[in-house]
Amino acid sequence: NFEYLCVDRKKRNMENKPLAERMRPKSLEDYIGQQHLVGPGKVLRKMIDSGVVSSFILWGPPGVGKTTLAMIIAEQLKRPFYVLSAVSSGVKDVREVIQKAEGQRFFNTPNPILFIDEIHRFSKAQQDSLLAAVEKGTVTLIGATTENPSFEVISPLLSRCQVYVLKSQEKKDLEDLIDRAVAKDYYLSKRNITVKEKEAMISYSGGDARKLLNIL
């Protein structure tokens, strides 16, 4: 009975999650779009295959896979993964993560990845607090931003990071995303759904995959 209750609770928790979260890719094989970065022989694919990842910033519009890509990289490389949102985190939060990372080095733990969403919202002081840890390699920073990093990220931090541009999802990728969700999502796949308004949905989403899935 206890096992059944646990499984049932997990199903309810999953059902309560937005479709975009339920369909979040767990590997590059399921990742849609951005082939100029993750396709065979491309820069991020080579970085992952080599197991050596340097700090970088992902710049692109909403819903193009910035957070998902960071999560996949951490998973593929089996790195500890810390997430901070620039909207709700401060210098104290950054320092706490860095202290944890420094403590883990004594246990031969791989350098953690620190993912900062909306890094352009960090103040100069908040960005300054990252510099030493990034320079020493205490953490590998992956920042995500919808704004031009040249204007929003301080020069000393920007000089320590590569910047990779993510593009809006192409129509074919978004069509594939709809088909995959209908076929593979645990709940949608049981309802025999046929999507007749793909064009309208894709147009309304504006190339934002997250928005598209949540419309569905």
Region annotations inferred by a language model:
Residues 15-17, 46-84, 100-102, 131-132, ...:
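Walker A/P-loop
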Residues 39-41, 81-113:
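Short glycine-rich substrate-engagement loop in P-loop NTPases that contacts/grips substrate
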Residues 85, 162-175:
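Conserved AAA+ ATPase "SRH/arginine-finger" region at the nucleotide-binding site
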Residues 79, 155-168:
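A short helix-turn-beta junction within AAA+ P-loop NTPase domains corresponding to the substrate/partner-engaging
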Residues 2-50:
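A short, basic N-terminal segment
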Residues 178-198:
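Helix-loop-helix "sensor" segment of P-loop NTPases
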Residues 196-210:
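A short helix-loop-helix "switch/interaction" segment in the helical subdomain of ASCE P-loop NTPases
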Residues 120-159:
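Conserved catalytic/switch belt of AAA+ P-loop NTPases
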